Amino acid sequence: MIRGSIVALVTPMRADGSVDWERLRSLVNWHVEQGTHAIVAVGTTGESATLGFEEHDSVIREVVALAKGRLPVIAGTGANNTEEAIRLTRDAKRDGADACLLVTPYYNKPPQEGLYQHFLAIARAVDIPQILYNVPGRTSCDLLPETVERLSKVPNIVGIKEATGNLERAREIRERCSDDFMLYSGDDATAMDFILAGGHGDISVTANVAPAKMAAMCEAALAGDADTARALNAELEPLHRDLFIEANPIPVKWALFEMGLIDAGIRLPLVPMSEAAQPRLRETMRQCGLLEVK
């Protein structure tokens, strides 16, 4: 199964909000060159909430075609409507995704049994490796370790992206589930410690702008080389912090625009990063070697 630095890829857009297919192709090729280990297409960072069905499928299809034979692709196919999630997951399998990432249902706040039945229904409907995604800070819905344990026994539910940043939570899941159940961090700030504690990788926002260094940090942590991992992570920590100075993916898209890698487009209800926040992130990017010092 997939290990290492998995970029939660942005969906590049033009100023009018339309998908920028040329920039998308360039980003995928850049991640191959930079040593990224895998790509998540149309996750939260990819603005899944504001892409229509056809756009959602088209972005996944394009990323799969571009990455084929070079990088595994995990398709974001979660929804708070079980039938919608099944449809998106079926489409991703048809289009050749290697696995799917399924966020917990947001807004409708299902109980733990509802979460279990939701993910079980998707797994039974579509035979593709499926990764659970727990991010209660965004969804107001927390997938508890005992429910993860139950779901880990479903053959094609193969792992979880745990984005609480709670390392004790990660350790509990590790203890409850079999060794082949994959644990991915969804919190860049704690990802190094997460991997050193037995995790298998990081589904990363920071990897959008510093892919080579994120890949190297994850490789060192996976190899148990804590000193190298800590040294690399110390260089990345300012990005881990300031790429969340406003709601994700607002800062990371602005950073990529400053690097000349994408246009400035983002879809409502998100808006471009405020002018007040720009100097701080720009200075952090300069300190991290992402921009020329002027």
Swiss-Prot record:
Pathway: Amino-acid biosynthesis; L-lysine biosynthesis via DAP pathway; (S)-tetrahydrodipicolinate from L-aspartate: step 3/4. SMART domains: DHDPS (SM01130). Its EC number is 4.3.3.7. It is found in: Cytoplasm. Keywords: Amino-acid biosynthesis, Cytoplasm, Diaminopimelate biosynthesis, Lyase, Lysine biosynthesis, Schiff base. One of its GO terms (molecular function) is 4-hydroxy-tetrahydrodipicolinate synthase activity. Coiled coil: none annotated. GO terms for biological process: diaminopimelate biosynthetic process; lysine biosynthetic process via diaminopimelate. One of its GO terms (cellular component) is cytosol. The active site is at Y133 (proton donor/acceptor), K161 (schiff-base intermediate with substrate). Homotetramer; dimer of dimers. Catalyzes the condensation of (S)-aspartate-beta-semialdehyde [(S)-ASA] and pyruvate to 4-hydroxy-tetrahydrodipicolinate (HTPA). Belongs to the DapA family. This is 4-hydroxy-tetrahydrodipicolinate synthase. It comes from Alcanivorax borkumensis (strain ATCC 700651 / DSM 11573 / NCIMB 13689 / SK2).
